[in-house]
Amino acid sequence: ELVAFIWDYYVRHPEFVTILATENLHQGQHARKSQNLKALSGEAVGVLRPIIEAGQAKGLFRDDIDITHAYLMIASLCYFYNSNRHTLSSFLAVDLADKQAKADWLVFISDLALRGLRR
């Protein structure tokens, strides 16, 4: 499942989350200069496109889905938890680094993403 793939990538590569956060602090100045970034973003959205289109062909997913919006929804739900887990753990008095907490969040966001795409 795509949600699990993106989630697992962020969990296994916390350095990537840190790089994204740092790059955003610098207002994307290095990302704008990257020759490879557009190709990478095309691949990320490209992975999602056949999944969405297959779901639409089967009548499972809405016909009005914007692929970019769907990707942003999934990536946002995965990124926010991982990039803010330290402060949110303190704020919510919950250990968001706990294995079960992460598993529960993945189940929740997978369900949420499907609800957003289904007819």
Can you name each region flagged by the protein language model?
Residues I67-T68:
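Membrane-interface starts of transmembrane alpha-helices
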Residues R12-Q35, N84-F91:
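Amphipathic alpha-helical segments used for helix-helix packing
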Residues E1-L2, R32-S41:
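Amphipathic alpha-helical linker/stalk segments
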Residues F5-D8, R12, G42-F61, M73-R119:
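C-terminal peripheral helix-coil segments that are non-catalytic and often amphipathic
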Residues H26, Y71-L72:
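Short secondary-structure capping/turn micro-motifs that flank functional sites
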